[in-house]
Amino acid sequence: MLKIIQGALDTRELLKAYQEEACAKNFGAFCVFVGIVRKEDNIQGLSFDIYEALLKTWFEKWHHKAKDLGVVLKMAHSLGDVLIGQSSFLCVSMGKNRKNALELYENFIEDFKHNAPIWKYDLIHNKRIYAKERSHPLKGSGLLA
């Protein structure tokens, strides 16, 4: 399941619901990654734009990989502004045992960092400045010559 949430994530609420689901399904593995906006240089926070249709397609591929491994994959990401100390990204992989859940967890997070259609901006003096040096070009993107 993919959730796009305006502003910072309420990780307590999300994790509570996901953990209850894991318990109801009698899963023994519950792997969590939470991205927290950290203080860096003179930023107030980060801001995110999302190409929703592409993100849904990208996530669906991972959802099917997870299902093939007997793992349930959950992801939530912020849209818009997220201040220092708040969470912008949460993913959970859960399954019967740790092996498949952990394997998927690492690969998913790395692929997310490089291929998810989410654009990051620094918030500096209440202005959004594209974080080009911390961004990765999407495969197949760019201008046609």
UniProtKB/Swiss-Prot annotation:
Stated family: Belongs to the MoaE family.
SUPFAM superfamilies per the UniProt record, alphabetical: Molybdopterin synthase subunit MoaE
Role, per record: Converts molybdopterin precursor Z into molybdopterin. This requires the incorporation of two sulfur atoms into precursor Z to generate a dithiolene group. The sulfur is provided by MoaD.
EC number(s) stated in the UniProt entry for this protein: 2.8.1.12
Keyword Glycoprotein in record: no
Protein's organism: Helicobacter pylori (strain ATCC 700392 / 26695) (Campylobacter pylori)
Family matches, as InterPro entries: MoaE_sf, Mopterin_biosynth_MoaE
Gene Ontology terms: biological process: Mo-molybdopterin cofactor biosynthetic process
GO molecular function, one term: molybdopterin synthase activity
CDD domains listed in its UniProt record: MoaE
Keyword Membrane attributed: no
Subunit structure: Heterotetramer of 2 MoaD subunits and 2 MoaE subunits. Also stable as homodimer. The enzyme changes between these two forms during catalysis.
Disulphide-bridged cysteine pairs: none
Database matches in Gene3D superfamilies: Molybdopterin biosynthesis MoaE subunit
CC per GO annotation: cytosol
Transmembrane regions listed in the UniProt entry: none
Name recorded for this polypeptide: Molybdopterin synthase catalytic subunit
Pathway(s) per entry: Cofactor biosynthesis; molybdopterin biosynthesis
Catalyses which reaction(s): 2 [molybdopterin-synthase sulfur-carrier protein]-C-terminal-Gly-aminoethanethioate + cyclic pyranopterin phosphate + H2O = molybdopterin + 2 [molybdopterin-synthase sulfur-carrier protein]-C-terminal Gly-Gly + 2 H(+)
Binding site for substrate: I36, V37, R38, N97, R98, K113, K120, Y121, D122
Key words, A-Z: Molybdenum cofactor biosynthesis, Transferase
Top-level EC class: transferase
